[in-house]
Design a protein with these regions (language model features):
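Positively charged n-region of N-terminal signal peptides that target proteins for export
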Residues: 1-4
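Bacterial signal peptide processing site
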Residues: 21-24
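An amphipathic alpha-helical core segment
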Residues: 141, 145-189
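Post-signal-peptide N-terminal segment of Sec-exported extracytoplasmic proteins
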Residues: 27-78
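Mid-length scaffold segments of soluble, non-membrane domains
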Residues: 89-153
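A cross-kingdom marker for long, charged
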Residues: 189-220
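Hydrophobic helical h-region of N-terminal Sec-dependent signal peptides
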Residues: 6-14
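C-terminal motif of bacterial Sec signal peptides marking the signal peptidase cleavage site
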Residues: 15-19
Length: 220
């Protein structure tokens, strides 16, 4: 029992020490310093997330969790045949081309224009506070920009027709006919997946910062 109490005391002390270090780093920041920190946090998180779109992003666990149910069903069905797997490859390729090209500049511009007065509250906003703000501020704008880009990529590389063909008779019950189009589903999944991956990257950077600015802010 004494060992258990001692362990609890030690863990509590460590937690309080870490919290104090973070608060100490945040307490003395000017609005401009806080803004520099938020921008470093978001720029690093977005770069990390966008790298994930360079490979087989549909196999990314975070991406899969963020997908709308309709897209998750489609990708699962496609994985059951060689024709479907080829179609998945085209879908991955379309995402890898469209998402980084559109999202990189858009997110960078939004990040540059974050008001300095909001910066400190974003740093104090929890593990994914900055990403949550960015999603709320730019999520709809990003989705609107991604939709035509993804549609074009899937049209140009033959992905739309390949996916429809691979789904066969099930296609009509999954896409269109009052349901979201395939491009809409993919855009929704790409948008939510990107922000989910950014949130993971932000959390990791807060807990174990690699950026010199963030090391100072988060007391690591």
């Amino acid at each position: 029992m004494k060992k258990f109490v001692s362990l609890l005391f030690t863990l509590s002390f460590v937690f309080m020490t870490q919290s104090c270090n973070v608060n100490k780093g945040l307490a003395g920041l000017s609005p401009q310093q806080a803004l520099t920190g938020v921008q470093a946090l978001l720029n690093g998180s977005s770069k990390s997330a966008l790298k994930g779109f360079g490979g087989n992003v549909l196999k990314n666990a975070v991406m899969q969790k963020a997908m709308p149910k309709g897209l998750s069903t489609i990708t699962s069905l496609l994985g059951n045949s060689s024709e479907g797997n080829k179609a998945l490859g085209l879908l991955n390729g379309a995402l890898g081309s469209a998402v980084p090209n559109v999202a990189s500049s858009l997110l960078s511009n939004v990040t540059k224009n974050i008001p300095a007065a909001d910066a400190l509250s974003l740093l104090k906003g929890g593990d994914t506070g900055a990403t949550d703000f960015l999603k709320k501020t730019a999520g709809k704008k990003l989705a609107a920009a991604l939709l035509p880009a993804i549609t074009k990529q899937l049209t140009d590389n033959g992905g739309l027709s390949a996916i429809t063909s691979a789904l066969g008779s099930k296609a009509s019950s999954l896409i269109g006919n009052g349901k979201p189009s395939l491009a809409d589903l993919v855009t929704s999944g790409a948008t939510d997946g990107l922000f989910a991956m950014m949130g993971n990257a932000e959390k990791a950077e807060r807990n174990n910062p690699t950026d010199p600015i963030l090391k100072e802010i988060f007391g690591k």
